[in-house]
Amino acid sequence: MGGLWDDLHIFAMDIMTIKSDRIHIYILNNTFMNKQAITLLFMLPVLTAGAQNPIIRGIYAADPTARVFNDKVYVYPSHDIMPPEGQRQDWFCMADYHVFSSENLTDWTDHGMIISQENVPWGNPEGYSMWAPDCVYKDGKYYFYFPDAPKEGRGFAIGVATADSPEGPFVCEPEPIKGVMGIDPCVLVDNDGQAYIYWSGMGIRGAKLKANMKELDGELTELRFPGNANAQAPNIPPILVGGQAMEGLPEGFKEGPFAFRRGDWYYLTFPWVRGDTSNGQNPTETLAYSMSRSPLGPWDFKGIIMAEHDNTCWTNHHSIVEYKGQWYIFYHRNDYSPSDDKRRSARVEKIAFNDDGTIQEVFQTKRGVGISQATSVLQPDRYSAASDDVSVAYVDTLDRFQGWQVSLPKPGSWLCYSDVDFSGVTKGNAMVRVKACADAEFSLREGSMNTGTVIARFKVKGGKDASKGEWMTLTAPLEYTPKGVTDLAITCELGAVDIDWVQF
């Protein structure tokens, strides 16, 4: 865009808010050297993310709860942020919630913020404790369940907000649910319309909800903390707790329950630390599950759905949903913050069941799920398979949301990026963003690593740009155009090359 934009210098640190169709920006006026607040109004597309893992780019999105509403998948994650100065340093810090949706599990739309800690009537407006949420539909209304730190007292409470649309606007109830003291709410609406709520806090608990979806159906029990009989903590008042502890779960730390029904089986899934913590070790969480013929158990522990992360991300948190005949598991890890496991990002994989209802183990991938359009920007660093010498690094370590680059270090190096739809390709060329420090050659092929039909060939000439290893965008004519959905392979044939993206 020309005109106004030619004269403005907009700094990333000066952007205050991006919401809906408005961008609120502070602009440094070079003439008067002061800050002026303006609002630029555009009909902007809402932010989207691509098909690969992580599925959300631009913000941290942990604890993803996926639900199917109106033939779309909606994801309700928590929103990790960097701690404000003096607040919750080196700990989880979350001040609001966003909601995302997709019709193809490839293109994700951010519908913006739906609830902030500042508009929860009973919550601490500076608590930064809006952890894992859930959202369900019943009788024409959408019910959003979320934990928060209360203004009065200690610990967590769980509140409810309602809306007429899965995207909001949501209106918070004036008080949290009585008898639910904890985090990680999950609500299961059974086939007969009865709703159940599960949460973690003093173990994993579950309870029936009343028809209004805002109250527990049952008596509350007075629970006294051990500190009441201890001179070190004599003033901790008892609390009223509803529901019941879930029986039949394994020993060890558990949180984040997610319950669902498939056929006649009920599943209670949860993050679980299966390692030994008694010797000072700090093993990370697995995702595990139990099964029952009843929504509140007793439960029969079955095992692991997903093993521990292969990095230092201590937590995992998930949801499981069926969409268009396929089951998926949504989870998180710290892809964009490798040295900080308090800033996490949502991922998704396919999940499968055995004939007896048990769940097959799921393995984490870069590629994730969904079909990528060849006409979109493809990120080969999210490959499905690769030779052992291929490596991945951030494009910009100061802005990790720019994603990754992949390095093919020598002739014979290869990678495969699965499920690319070429049906929309009308141009006669391919584009790549690459860098190399010397002459390099590589090809794009259909299918397997080095035996598939060549789609396009690229040559990077040594010289000024190559010797500096600077990024450049190259174009090459198509020698062949695949039909429909197929795999894309990239093979290195001379030298070494780094690739950021590919597009047809």
Residues covered by each model-derived region:
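Bacterial Sec-dependent N-terminal signal peptides
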Residues: 1, 5, 10-16, 21-52
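Carbohydrate-active catalytic/glycan-binding domains of CAZyme proteins
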Residues: 50-504
